[in-house]
Amino acid sequence: MPAGLSYSLTGNPNFNTDIGGFFCGSYNTRGSGSAPKNPQFQELYVRWMQYGLFCPVFRSHGADAPREIWQFGQKGEPVYDAIEKQIRLRYRLLPYLYSTAWQVTSNNDSYMRPLFSDFAGDQRVWDMTDEFMFGRSILACPIVDPQYTEEKIIRTNAMTGWDRKELTIDNGQLTINWTDAKTAVKYLPKGAKWYDFWTNQQYNGGQDVTLTTSFDRVPMFVRAGSILPLGPEMQYVGEKTWDNLELRLYPGADGQFTLYEDEGDNYNYEQGQYATITFKWNDRSRQLTIGQRNGSYKGMLQKRQFTLVMPDGQTKQVDYDGSETSVKF
C-alpha cells in the first residue's frame, strides 16, 4: 500500500500489484502448484484481492502456482465465494472507476489518494499507510494482518518484514472455520461523516471504530455527500449496458459526481467523442439534480433510468433522456 500511494504522489497513477505475490513457492507445501490449497495462501490471496479491489488495475498474476478462482475450491465454499465476491464488486464499481479514470487523465486526479491529500488537518492520517481514499468517495481499509491462520507480519516504518510460521496440523489435517466473525479497528478521518458500505451505519469522523469483520468483506466506507454509481453484475466489460445504473446517495453533506462514458474500446474520446452527466446533491433541501448530458459518442444511450438508493432504504426510479431533472427525498 505505501508503494501504491507513493507512486500516485509521483504522478504515476496506474499502480497495481501481482495479487498473491509473483513468487509463492514457499506456500507450495504439498507439492508443486499446491499453494491455492494452503490455508495461509488462501487467506493471503483473499485479503490481497480485497486490496486489489481498490487499485487502478485489478490483476492476478504470478509464478509457482496457478491463480484461477477454481484452483481455490468451488462455488459454495468460503474461499471461492470470497474471491468471487471481490470480482463481482469490482465489476459493479466500473462506472465509478471509469469516471475516476477520466478525472485522472483530464484533470490530473488520482485513483489511490493518501489520506493527507484530503484530510491534511488531521494529524492522525499524516503517516497512515494501511488506509487510503479510492477516488474521492471511498475510504479503503483493507485487512492487512492474518485473522484465520498463523502468520506474523512485522512492520517498521511502513516497510514490511516477513516471518512465516508453519501451521500446526493435527493428524495431517487443518480445519479453519472461514465463517467465524473477527474484529478490526479502523480510523475514520476527521472532517467528514462516513457510512459503512456494507451496513450503511453512519459514523462521525475523527475516531477509531471497532468493526465486526468477515472473511469475504473488506472494510470500506463512503464519505457523506458522495454519489456512488454502481453498474450491473457482469462476467466481462460490455456484457451489459448501463441503462439502469444504481446511484447510491449518502446524505450528510453537499456533493457531486460526474459520470463519464464513451465507446469503451477505442481512442475516439481523444477527438471529443464522449459524454458526461453531473449529479449534484443538496443536503439542506435533500434534492438530487441530474444535470443535462454534455457531449455524445457512437452508440450512446439516448434514454435510460437511474435507480436512486438512500442508506435508509428509500428508493426512487428516474427516467432520463439527457435533460436536467431533479428528485427530492
Question: PLM features: what roles do these ranges have?
Answer:
Residues 215-324, 329:
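Accessory, solvent-exposed terminal regions and/or long lumenal/extracellular loops of proteins
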Residues 1-216:
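Catalytic-domain carbohydrate-binding cleft regions of carbohydrate-active enzymes
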